Amino acid sequence: MPHPARFTTALAVEAHKLRRSLALLLAAVAPLLIAVFVFFNLLRVDKAAPWAMTLQSSAAIWAFFMLPMSVTALTALVAHTEHGPRAWDHLRALPLPRWHLYASKAVCVLGVVAAMSVLLALLTLLAATGAGWLKPAVAATGAMDIAGYLTLLGRIFLAAWLLVAVQLWIALRYASFVPALAVGIGGTFFAVVATSAKIGMLLP
């Protein structure tokens, strides 16, 4: 079987494993939590905010906190599908290049993160619109720059590739959840507290 066909098969198998795990639940809950926060935060105030501020607030929460934590949990779940049943020996004995095993997992994780970004955009728009409908005084003002918002989320997604690579390597390297979770939580903490520092730009 040609290598492209083998990789497609490995990718399909990995996607099937994801559907049977909690990864899809995580992919739905993380963006939903941000949308719920945006919704109730808008209802809490008495003054309308521009669309740009509302959308940038959603993107900031996603980039600084929810995305790193989601990637940490997602990569741990993906790795646990093999670590749990101790299936690595069987997988590595299969007649296909080993890089297919790892690349298919990376592609699936990136695909889920991309889907989460799209879902975040949709839910944020619905949350802001719904808050304005329930409380007209806080209805977002100004132009709704959806293209700019999607571009921002796309740039955040591209910047997250390094984060995915690091977290997935750690999750695959160690059978325990602890190292991957420790690095993910620690990295998120330092990225948040070092936002205003010069070193903050070096933290994925």
Predicted feature locations:
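Generic transmembrane alpha-helix motif of multi-pass integral membrane proteins
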Residues: 14, 18, 92, 165-175, ...
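Aromatic- and glycine-rich beta-strand/loop motifs that create alpha-glucan
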Residues: 1-28
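Transmembrane helix boundary and interhelical loop/hinge segments in multi-pass membrane proteins
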Residues: 73-92
